[in-house]
Amino acid sequence: MKIEWFGHSCFRINDSLVIDPYQDESVPGCPLLRLSASRAIYSHQHADHYGIGCVTIIPNDGADFQITEIPSWHDNQHGALRGPNTIHIIEHEGLRIAHLGDLGCELNGEQKKLLQNLDILMIPIGGFYTIDAKQAAVIVGELSPKCTIPMHYRGDNFGYDELGTVDLFTKYFNEAEIKTVGHILELDSDLPKVAVMDFPR
């Protein structure tokens, strides 16, 4: 299995499932998306996660994904500030992947139970609109995924100014646990505890 990151919170799994594509020019510094897949899923309907027109759907390409939706909030006031958020658990080829979308609050007990035994956790870390780096590190400790991919943060030349940088998250882990990878993460090799991805420029 392979995972591609296109910046912000947008990923594609095995060329078949796109998660949270962003609309054109909605995220500073991120490339325009022109993707194809058999399916696209969205955590919520804000422009930086809901680029419906940026994904060409090619049906019946044989991909078999089992997807579970977990309701959550985009803020810590039960959605009063930014509305609802959907966490997705994706099961494919014997692996469990969770994408937390724009999670803006702590996980409750039931959510934590559903999010156990993860191979990959995609988690926002930038703060302001979502949980911040410290809160994200706590959640990683609670869920103990095999590998965590940080998302929704600011880099040197991409992302919103209000967001924190990835080093604010990685400082909570040992250097040996962190690996910087490219645009594509292959899941058939040994996975680091934290995989910091890049996206095509």
What is the predicted role of each segment?
Residues 37-38, 119, 146:
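Conserved acidic residues
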Residues 79-143:
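Active-site-proximal loop/helix segments of hydrolase catalytic cores
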Residues 3-4, 81-82, 147-201:
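Binuclear metal-ion centers of metallo-dependent hydrolases, dominated by the metallo-beta-lactamase
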Residues 47-94, 171-191:
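Metallo-beta-lactamase
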Residues 2-6, 17-22, 66-72, 89, ...:
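Active-site-proximal beta-strand elements of phosphoester/diester hydrolases
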Residues 9-60, 71-85, 103-114:
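Pre-active-site segment of Zn-dependent metallo-hydrolases
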Residues 44, 125, 151-153:
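Short secondary-structure boundary segments
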